[in-house]
UniProtKB/Swiss-Prot annotation:
Subunit note: Homodimer.
Keywords: Amino-acid biosynthesis, Cytoplasm, Histidine biosynthesis, Hydrolase, Magnesium, Metal-binding, Zinc
Name recorded for this polypeptide: Phosphoribosyl-AMP cyclohydrolase
Role description: Catalyzes the hydrolysis of the adenine ring of phosphoribosyl-AMP.
Required cofactor(s): Mg(2+); Zn(2+)
Pathway: Amino-acid biosynthesis; L-histidine biosynthesis; L-histidine from 5-phospho-alpha-D-ribose 1-diphosphate: step 3/9
Compartment list: Cytoplasm
InterPro entries in the cross-refs: PRA-CH, PRib_AMP_CycHydrolase_dom, PRib_AMP_CycHydrolase_sf
Binding site for Mg(2+): 77, 79, 81
Major localization class: cytoplasm
Organism: Cereibacter sphaeroides (strain ATCC 17025 / ATH 2.4.3) (Rhodobacter sphaeroides)
GO CC annotations, alphabetized: cytoplasm
Tree of life domain: Bacteria
Keyword Hydrolase: yes
């Protein structure tokens, strides 16, 4: 069956959350938003394209930083309202220069940063 990005369930803004996960390690790297066109562009090019809510424009991950994300596989959750992007990440995924955007844990009631920026 052919996939149609319009078959996904988008929120009122026309967006769906997309979780980027390293395809080799399983590490969750980041979460961002996609609209139907961003999904289509990602599938067409193999380069992950998100929708920037702040800039109201497409954002090809790594286009300016060089920290690109290559799509290995796109997965759809059971409700069709969230995507899992299995990717190959080049460099840090986070704008803070960390491998993952999820670098702060709450442990024993306190926040603890456990991941340093990459060199």
């Amino acid at each position: 069956m052919a996939f149609d990005p319009a078959s996904l369930t988008y929120d009122a803004r026309g967006l769906v959350p997309a979780i980027a996960q390293d395809h080799a390690t399983g590490e969750v790297l980041m979460m961002a938003w996609m609209n139907a066109e961003a999904v289509a562009r990602t599938l067409e090019t193999g380069r992950v394209t998100y929708w920037s809510r702040s800039r109201q424009s497409f954002w090809v991950k790594g286009e300016t930083s060089g920290h690109i994300q290559r799509l290995v596989e796109l997965r759809i959750d059971c409700d069709r309202d969230c995507l899992l992007l299995l990717i190959e990440q080049v460099g840090p995924a986070c704008h803070t220069h960390r491998r993952s955007c999820f670098y702060t844990a709450v442990r024993e009631g306190a926040e603890q940063v456990f991941l340093d920026p990459m060199g």
